[in-house]
Amino acid sequence: MENKTEVTIHSHERLDELHRNGYWIIQDPGRFCFGMDAVLLSGFAKVKPGERALDLGTGTGIIPILLEAKTKGEHFTGLEIQPESADMASRSVAYNHLEEKITIVTGDIKEASARFGAGSFEVITTNPPYMIGQHGIQNDANAKTIARHEVLCDLDDILRESAKMLKQGGRFYMVHRPFRLAEIFSKMVAYHIEPKRMRLVYPFVNKEPNMVLIEGLRGGKSRLTVEKPLIVYKEPGVYMPEIYDIYGY
């Protein structure tokens, strides 16, 4: 942690190593810490030299920070509606000296295109809430509920705003749950974001998939490539080699 900018890290927060470029991230275990889905999305998304990328619902900024480490993108923006999470993301950006490459913005996904403008990004990424509406909510709309359930925005909001902000031929990357694939594809096509690439994620080789990684192309032609399955665990507690590589271990 040498040569890091001095930023405030509160007593309820922690610093987690990201194993990429010596980067670290500030998180609050009492709120919502990033999971494997965000890391896998950062390994699936492609940001080319000179491209600008936007992460919708960035949380503590994990996806922009990892994409900055892994790609040659020109600039990365993270949009987050919860001020506390956005503040942690901004401090992580400063801690890693990434202020010139990453911008964190506090705001609502439903108003994103009005804020950033039409055709303003070549790439949009998102790790959105998976659960529909109020289904399964046991408590008030706290940080964890907002991250997991479509309380403040839904899939339609994300795709509508993404379609406006993507340049023609721009790429949309999302991690979601397989049980919603029919709805996802239907809404993507409705907003002229053509599904182009998909990879199912399996916890074990003999289990059903529990995540799906999707790439869409703004204004693309109809042709979907289904990539080989991504298996997470070789055995309980032991990742497959590809997972270790994605994490940077």
Residues of each region from the PLM?
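SAM/dcSAM-binding transferase cores
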Residues: 208-249
